[in-house]
Amino acid sequence: MSFISVLRLPIALFLFAIGLTHAYAQGESASIIQVKLLRESSIMAPVAGEVINVGSLNKNVELMVYPLNDDYYEFTFGNGRGLIDKDDLEPVQKSKKVLGLELADLQKLNQNLITTRTTVLYNHPKAKSGVFGELSENLRYPILGRLKGDDGVLWYEINVGDDVKYVRADDCELDNGIPVLTYHHVLKDDENRLFRNTSTTTSDTAFDAQMGYLKSAGYRTLSLAQLEGYLNNSVNLPAKAVVLTFDDGLKSVYRYAYPILKKYGQQATAFIISSRVKHNPQPWDANSLQFMSISEIKQIQDVFDIQSHTHFLHRYSDDKRPVLLSRTEHNIQLDFERSARVLKPFNPKVLYVSYPFGGYNDKAIEAARLAGYRLAVTTVRGKVKPGDNPYTLKRLYVLRTDSIDAMAERIANNRSDVKPMAVRQ
């Protein structure tokens, strides 16, 4: 959540957004109350750290809520909690139907639905079922199961307020994962003489256009901590979400990428080769690969999260393969740990690593885990999905020569390679 967003929130909603709520603090011992809505009510929830409107619930529907404060109750919503105005509710005696009974038979499937428009929530998997409420567009929501109704319509089962509700499959999309974009070097076209045919070098104008597209299309740039929460099914995120990563820690990132990201209000991760951090800034030279200095890394930290690209392992061995692949697990672990120590003045929580040149093996995976890293990214192409191995995460490239339409197609949720789910009849 940005500082500006925090200023706009009452203190109760700010505490709610960061998870410091009464029910969470009390855990399972928190009192749970069954309530009925006196009128249609808007609902809010933290999505990527910002409390936003996420839908509405209809008059007379019932749900289970937890005490929060004098103004709000909270309730189960997706991978977290939602928020509803106390004035819109009244406690009721437990109805003949015990809410939450069906949930015991259902578990999260490591699959989400995506709302591309306002999406109706039904009480039962029937076309003429009563309507419980609506979900707003641009949400990811965990699916508990799917089934076919008597009329052959496919339905998704989800948990709202500790009860099973139903969404028609043709009212939403299946989540195909979050794109993690990879960048390295940024130059102006008129100064790029040596790296024009290098796929890892983009132009400042192309990068500006790409970041402008993300902004205008409504994409939210995520931190790796939020991506970790997505993998663990512990956070609510928008449907339009992307992670931006920069490998190496080149000076061109400070010179060109940083001001562009700042202009569009984006955040990104810089994977730094810790042994190449300079003590003092170097005079700019577009014809060489220069690395950021201590002061330059500090300046970009309002936009960039500083993470590891190893210490001495970013090089090739004599056989032209990443040197990491020829090292023992112990030596890899020592390098990973050293990199985290060197980067600690910039970030006390160096928890994520990018394998040099995308090269990794079982030894590198285990070394990353033992060194205390919680995610590791590769250069294998694809999106990140719940259930993926956190130490072999895929990424995508957007090239200098790619059109904005090509980029939009690459990051959109429009592919069909999602894992099939069992259907209950």
Q: What do these predicted regions represent?
A:
Residues 116, 150, 163-241, 402, ...:
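N-terminal pre-catalytic segment of deacetylase/amide-hydrolase enzymes
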Residues 10-19:
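Bacterial N-terminal signal peptides
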Residues 1-10:
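Bacterial N-terminal signal peptides that target proteins for export
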Residues 176-201, 239-242, 256, 262-361, ...:
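Metal-dependent polysaccharide deacetylase catalytic core of the NodB/CE4 family, i.e.
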Residues 43-46, 74, 122-124, 188-193, ...:
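Short, solvent-exposed loop/turn elements at domain surfaces
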Residues 53-86, 134-169:
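SH3/SH3-like beta-barrel superfamily modules
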Residues 26-31, 76-108, 157-186:
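Boundary regions of SH3-family modules and the immediately adjacent low-complexity/disordered segments
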